[in-house]
Amino acid sequence: MEKPSAQVADNSKIINQLREAGINPTQQRIEIAQILLAQPQHMSAEQVLSQVNREQPLVSKATVYNTLGLFASKGLLREVIVDPSKIFYDSNTSPHQHFYNVDTGLLKDIDSTTVQIQHLPSLPEGTMADGVDIIIRLRNRQ
């Protein structure tokens, strides 16, 4: 079991991280941040909702979705859209790519040093590249 003093230190760190991002640290936002920002991981909104309400359901589905969107817009999380109906929230916001196993639903980071993009196509006039997302979709061998 985690010591109370360690929990207070973690809360202070999370609160400071939220404030530095310009986010008001409400209790629900702190709880969601503790789940997602504790370690590099990928979670869906449903997984976050389940985890945050594991002991006592206090956070609504709308609050989770709104908070995840806010965290992503402020750069605390990265949205990884593996298909139109499946979005993961990635606590690793540095540039990197992913493997997505369609059969298992597992999303895994790819070491960015192993992927090289040598040439991008010409961009439409008046635009600039904002990023390149690569998701390699996998299936298990039958």
Give residue spans per PLM region.
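Short, Lys/Arg-enriched N-terminal segment that forms or immediately precedes the first helix
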Residues: 10-22
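Basic amphipathic alpha-helical segments that dock to polyanions
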Residues: 64-71
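Non-DNA-binding regulatory cores of transcription-related proteins
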Residues: 73-142
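Pre-recognition alpha-helix immediately N-terminal to the DNA-recognition helix
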Residues: 30-35
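Short helix-capping/hinge SLiMs at alpha-helix to coil transitions
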Residues: 23, 37-40, 54-55
